[in-house]
Amino acid sequence: MFNIMLVKFVVIFALILASCRVEADNTSVLPEGFVDAAQRSTHTNNWAVLVDASRFWFNYRHVANVLSIYRSVKRLGIPDSQIILMIADDMACNARNPRPGQVYNNANQHINVYGDDVEVDYRGYEVTVENFVRLLTGRTQNGTARSKKLLSDAGSNVLIYLTGHGGDGFLKFQDSEEITSQELADGIQQMWEKKRYNELFFMVDTCQAASLYEKFTSPNVLAVASSLVGEDSLSHHVDPSIGVYMIDRYTYYALEFLEKVQPFSKRTIGEFLQVCPKRVCISTVGVRKDLYPRDPHKVPITDFFGAIRPTRVSTDRINVTLANEDDFIFDKDKMVTKKPFKIVMESQFPSELFK
């Protein structure tokens, strides 16, 4: 009896050792220094909602603000299909603009933030409180184009950036209507209840900006504001050639930080929250992180301003269909392929993906 039990024990112990060895072998296939994105964040995709809520030529800086953030998130990998850009006025084509088709955020004209490939989703009088709230909550009207929908889900990290003229508890849209802090809080709460975000970063550059996040109660929300209640947010500098301010102070220093960030940067949200100290911003930057479960100093900046790049390492054999002489034609000393090559990884993906 004792011998039988001893044999069983040895067999079980051997199986445990074997399973541990297999697990170790599987882990060892990761390249040195490789960090799985899932270890850093639970999100699976990124979205950005960028809003300039004011119009008229003297608010040129607000368009420059939003286009500066647009430039940054697009450069860091978020595609236009996952960026909703709302601009209340078209400064690039304004009759007062001496540089048609161009918008700069600096009097030295270092960066044309309008560029050649800006995709504006809501333009002019389409930028309304109703459309903004419908966008956030997923209640867009029938017939709304896909490019005008926030198609986020429970795995989405969402960046919301707002700029314009505001006051204690409100932000003006088009100088004719307002969205209140309570309406913003309700919209974000609906997003949470409908599983429309995993984590949300709320960023606002306006006067008394911190008042806009005071009503928030939804989980996983991190917020930053360019000024506290009772403070004005100030502009940075004037371009004498066009007679208006170019950009606001907070967004200017935020862009200065983001321009140094690369897609695989180790810079953190915690660092970003400190980009505009009072000595340069004049106003006091407000931060709200009581609803956010992670330490901002351990959250990569690209969790919100970049696009996640899921990577899976496989040890499966890859069959490569090699070319032969019949696959090429020669035309004036140029070699041109007639048939596309196929690389097929067995047992990993359905064959229709390679058709």
UniProtKB/Swiss-Prot annotation:
Pfam families: Peptidase_C13 (PF01650)
UniProt keyword Membrane present: no
Residues the record marks as active site: H165, C207
Disulfide bond entries: none
GO cellular component: endoplasmic reticulum; GPI-anchor transamidase complex
Signal peptide: 1-24
One BP annotation, GO: proteolysis
Keywords of this entry: GPI-anchor biosynthesis, Hydrolase, Protease, Signal, Thiol protease
Keyword Mitochondrion: no
UniProt GO molecular function: GPI-anchor transamidase activity
Pathway noted in the entry: Glycolipid biosynthesis; glycosylphosphatidylinositol-anchor biosynthesis
Its biological purpose: Mediates GPI anchoring in the endoplasmic reticulum, by replacing a protein's C-terminal GPI attachment signal peptide with a pre-assembled GPI. During this transamidation reaction, the GPI transamidase forms a carbonyl intermediate with the substrate protein.
Protein name (Swiss-Prot/TrEMBL): Putative GPI-anchor transamidase
